[in-house]
């Protein structure tokens, strides 16, 4: 005989969350990486853009561990949200940076500075309003909803911080490395003209 009702059903669902969540998050990240590489036509740009989402997921897992909260039905939804928000922040920053490099004919440092001036404030405002909405969810009387709000707020905050710190640093280093490589390649001598 087996017990029926909501308790065994919830227990069974909770037991299946971790492998399902791990698999779906990994698949989402791989597909996002593929799309980003195609959009930017560059493996480095695609992977650097994805770092924002990766930092958000790491923050989610770390915060759950620190708070000793279980991965339940509500907190398992956070990864999907964080991947979406993180990739969005990353795309906006990378796209603007590439535009600044092409249109402004400036070096990586100036392009990062221009990108931060034009986009940094907008990203911060977008993140703060989103985080504020999830902080409000933390005042819910339902414990899983409170956890969901807290974990999501922390993860989105980390996405914002990453998009304004780590990501610009990686873009700068990548561009400087490309400049050094281009400078190391000797220009070919022009062929003599035969008249």
Residue ranges and their predicted role:
Residues 1-195:
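Membrane-embedded transmembrane helical bundles of large multi-pass transporters/channels
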């Amino acid at each position: 005989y087996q017990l029926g009702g909501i308790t065994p059903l919830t227990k069974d669902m909770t037991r299946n969350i971790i492998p399902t969540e791990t698999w779906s998050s990994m698949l989402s990240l791989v597909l996002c990486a593929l799309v980003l590489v195609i959009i930017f036509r560059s493996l480095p740009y695609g992977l650097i853009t994805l770092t924002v989402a990766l930092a958000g997921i790491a923050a989610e897992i770390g915060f759950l561990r620190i708070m000793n909260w279980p991965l339940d039905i509500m907190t398992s939804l956070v990864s999907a949200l964080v991947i979406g928000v993180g990739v969005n922040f990353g795309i906006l920053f990378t796209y603007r940076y590439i535009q600044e490099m092409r249109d402004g004919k400036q070096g990586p440092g100036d392009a990062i500075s221009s990108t931060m001036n034009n986009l940094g404030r907008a990203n911060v405002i977008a993140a703060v309003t989103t985080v504020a909405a999830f902080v409000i969810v933390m005042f819910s009387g339902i414990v899983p909803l409170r956890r969901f709000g807290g974990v999501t707020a922390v993860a989105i905050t980390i996405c914002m911080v990453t998009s304004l710190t780590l990501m610009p640093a990686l873009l700068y280093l990548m561009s400087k490395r490309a400049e050094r490589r281009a400078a190391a390649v000797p220009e070919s001598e022009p062929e003599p003209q035969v008249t």
